[in-house]
């Protein structure tokens, strides 16, 4: 509407507006691409062919959904094996049927062979030819997952007593996934609609009572889990998702609360000099600034000069957090967590309050002992092993089953894996999968003081060695984290060269770590925190897949260590992992990529309240991304370095719709099946 007058002026002069024709053509093509017409021919032995026609939305149709449609369309009922191919052209331009083996193949088919319609062929194979679509059994929406069946099921006491919110998610997810079946009724003239539109302002008010109090917090989260939130409403709703408000506040009380907390933030911001000595404060500020200047600069909110108000607000927010939370301080990656919050809140004080809310849950990710990250790695391995034993075995044989290339995913909860606007939706959906956890009184903006004594750590008075950050020199003895790195150093000097962490594609920070391992470390040199294993050179790159050195004790269970018992299969080199723990059995020493490994037996998964340290859906998002690329990885035989480079190239490029849809289906399958082993969770928690 804003350009209407300009357009009329141009048309009045007799000259068409520049680029209007191209824009109109692009818009028409985009509109046409919203629906792809599909014609399918089923061929089975000597039986006459059968035909079906329907329409799909290419943005929300994955290969899994297409398989489900075809099973229902031809009444295959999962009892027969079949292959899918589409009519395309080979390199010589000849028409030929090309196999559909992955989502990438399907995207290619949509892009190159869908005019005037996509021609598919389904070839029914005899049942003895191959096993029956094992992956489909894992990732497909189940017909029996409908809410009427779920409500009639006999639920375990664990689920009923401890997981009422999870049970609600299960029921609601069942209703949503069953809508996949409605695709069969789509006709050429109908619009393809998403499962749920984003939450609107009008609908949000239905979750509030007449005094403005949130009366249905669980239902609100379930609604957001299905469809996200309208961008204009995020500023309001995210404060609930990040557990900023105490329970029961009215609308007026919420406004007064945020004003008071903002004033508290401004007071804390003015106390930097009182809370940190000049040398440490300058180091914190320079470290934060280095990251801020490389965080989401392509987004309009953070574009512009380096001294712009939004970059300055992000810098001050993170510096204040580091100064007021000495046990956590600042680590690289925190700017990625704060950036979307500030962009949505558009208010420095409000963003700081929300950042404190999310860091209450995520601060452990940045702890120098690495235990939280170790647990998440172990749980992701458990999940992948359970969901796709063949793919897990492939990664074992490739020496990549440590999943260290997923480090960035787990540390930042996948924030960098999607385009900025998609990441906002992914984050709110993930947060909504967690039960409400409002503060009892109010969000604490100041963390506990450091418990580290002055003597023996070489830090300044009242300032712990942790607060000195990253590669900053510091004196004193070793810590749990340093002991773990010592163990890695010992293991990496064993037969066969470097340990599993020391990959050719390692970061410069890991190269420095490798150099330090060549001889006894200088006790005055502080080793980098796992989130800081990135050199200044790589700061302009995506947060690469830096492994947590503590996990070296998982990766080398048979390696000698000065603090570990004599090496046996049952012994735990970390000293705090249970003997015979399945987690220890999962993470072994480096494998010979050329040596075939025995099949991996199935195993249970921790219950939701333990899985992923209480955030199980995030693990299923990671699993969905892995499975999206499974076929490509296995077909091309990617090794560890190639895997890491493959996913680094996909930073901010993953397809959110496909990943969310697959993750929800996998998550619903996990919740319904109750393949839970509390001992697994207990052992993982103890190990972490």
Curated annotation (Swiss-Prot):
Domain Rab-GAP TBC: 228-434
Skewed-composition ranges (Low complexity): 544-567
Modified residues (Phosphothreonine): 160
SMART domains cross-referenced by the UniProt entry: TBC (SM00164)
Chief localization: cytoplasm
Keywords annotated in UniProt: Autophagy, Cytoplasm, Cytoplasmic vesicle, GTPase activation, Phosphoprotein
Entry-linked Gene3D superfamilies: putative rabgap domain of human tbc1 domain family member 14 like domains, Ypt/Rab-GAP domain of gyp1p, domain 3
Any Gene Ontology CC annotation: autophagosome
Taxonomy, superkingdom: Eukaryota
Annotated spans, Disordered: 1-27, 544-606
Keyword Cytoplasm in record: yes
Residues annotated with Phosphoserine modification: 140, 506
Places the protein is found: Cytoplasm; Cytoplasmic vesicle, Autophagosome
GO biological process: autophagy; regulation of autophagosome maturation
Pro residues bias: start-end ranges: 596-606
Effect noted on mutating residue 136 to A: Abolishes interaction with GABARAP. Does not localize at autophagosomes
GO molecular function, one term: GTPase activator activity
Name of a matching Pfam family: RabGAP-TBC
Subunit field text: Interacts (via N-terminus) with MAP1LC3B, GABARAP and GABARAPL2.
Known function: Acts as a GTPase-activating protein specific for RAB33B. Involved in the regulation of autophagosome maturation, the process in which autophagosomes fuse with endosomes and lysosomes.
Name of this protein: TBC1 domain family member 25
């Amino acid at each position: 509407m804003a350009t209407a007058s300009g357009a009329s002026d141009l048309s009045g002069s007799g000259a068409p507006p520049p680029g209007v024709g191209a824009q109109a053509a692009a818009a028409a093509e985009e509109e046409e691409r919203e629906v792809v017409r599909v014609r399918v021919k089923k061929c089975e032995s000597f039986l006459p062919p059968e035909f079906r026609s329907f329409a799909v939305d290419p943005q929300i149709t994955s290969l899994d959904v297409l398989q489900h449609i075809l099973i229902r369309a031809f009444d295959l009922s999962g009892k027969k094996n079949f292959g899918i191919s589409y009519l395309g052209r080979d390199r010589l331009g000849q028409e030929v049927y090309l196999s559909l083996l992955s989502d990438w193949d399907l995207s290619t088919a949509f892009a190159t062979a869908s005019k005037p319609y996509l021609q598919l062929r389904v070839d029914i194979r005899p049942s003895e030819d191959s096993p029956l679509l094992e992956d489909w059994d894992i990732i497909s929406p189940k017909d029996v997952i409908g809410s009427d069946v779920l409500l009639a099921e006999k639920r375990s006491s664990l689920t009923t007593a401890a997981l009422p919110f999870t049970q609600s998610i299960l029921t609601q997810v069942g209703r949503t996934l069953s809508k996949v079946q409605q695709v069969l009724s789509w006709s050429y003239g109908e619009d393809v609609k998403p499962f749920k539109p984003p939450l609107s302002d009008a609908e949000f008010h239905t979750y509030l009572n007449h005094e403005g109090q949130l009366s249905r917090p669980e239902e609100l989260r379930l609604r957001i889990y299905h469809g996200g939130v309208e961008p204009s409403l995020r500023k309001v709703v995210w404060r609930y998702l990040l557990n900023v408000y105490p329970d029961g506040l009215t609308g007026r009380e919420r406004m007064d609360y945020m004003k008071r907390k903002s004033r508290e933030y401004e007071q804390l911001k003015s106390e930097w000099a009182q809370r940190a000595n000049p040398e440490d404060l300058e180091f914190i500020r320079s470290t934060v600034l280095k990251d801020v200047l490389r965080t989401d600069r392509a987004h309009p909110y953070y574009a512009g000069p380096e001294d712009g108000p939004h970059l300055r607000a992000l810098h001050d927010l993170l510096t204040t957090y580091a100064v007021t939370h000495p046990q956590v301080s600042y680590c690289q990656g925190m700017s990625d967590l704060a950036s979307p919050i500030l962009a949505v809140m558009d208010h420095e004080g409000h963003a700081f309050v929300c950042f404190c809310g999310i860091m209450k849950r995520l601060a452990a990710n940045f702890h120098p002992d690495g235990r939280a990250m170790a647990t998440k790695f172990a749980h992701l391995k458990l999940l992948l092993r359970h969901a796709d034993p063949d793919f897990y075995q492939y990664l074992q044989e490739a020496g990549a089953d440590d999943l260290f290339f997923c480090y960035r995913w787990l540390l930042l909860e996948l924030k960098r894996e999607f385009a900025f606007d998609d990441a906002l939706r992914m984050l709110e959906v993930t947060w909504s999968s967690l039960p409400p956890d409002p503060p009892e009184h109010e969000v604490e903006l100041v963390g506990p003081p450091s418990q580290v004594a002055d003597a023996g750590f070489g830090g300044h008075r009242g300032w712990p060695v942790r607060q000195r950050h990253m590669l900053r020199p510091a004196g004193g003895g070793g810590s749990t984290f340093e002991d773990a790195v010592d163990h890695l150093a010992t293991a990496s000097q064993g037969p066969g060269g470097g340990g599993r962490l020391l990959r050719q594609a390692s970061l410069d920070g890991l190269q420095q770590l490798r150099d330090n391992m060549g001889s006894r470390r200088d006790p005055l040199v502080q080793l980098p925190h796992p989130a800081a294993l990135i050199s200044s050179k790589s700061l302009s790159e995506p947060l690469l897949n830096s492994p947590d050195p503590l996990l070296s004790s998982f990766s080398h269970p048979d390696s000698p260590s000065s603090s570990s018992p004599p090496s046996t299969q049952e012994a735990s080199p970390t000293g705090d992992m249970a003997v015979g723990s399945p987690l220890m059995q999962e993470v072994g020493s480096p494998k010979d990529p050329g040596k075939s490994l025995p099949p991996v037996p199935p195993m249970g998964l921790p219950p939701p309240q333990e899985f992923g340290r209480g955030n199980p859906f995030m693990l299923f998002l990671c699993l969905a991304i892995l499975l999206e690329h499974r076929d490509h990885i296995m077909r091309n035989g990617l090794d560890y370095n190639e895997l890491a480079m493959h996913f680094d190239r996909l930073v901010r490029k993953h397809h959110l719709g496909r990943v969310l849809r697959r993750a929800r289906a996998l998550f619903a399958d996990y919740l319904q099946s109750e393949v839970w082993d509390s001992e697994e969770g207990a052992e993982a928690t103890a190990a972490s």
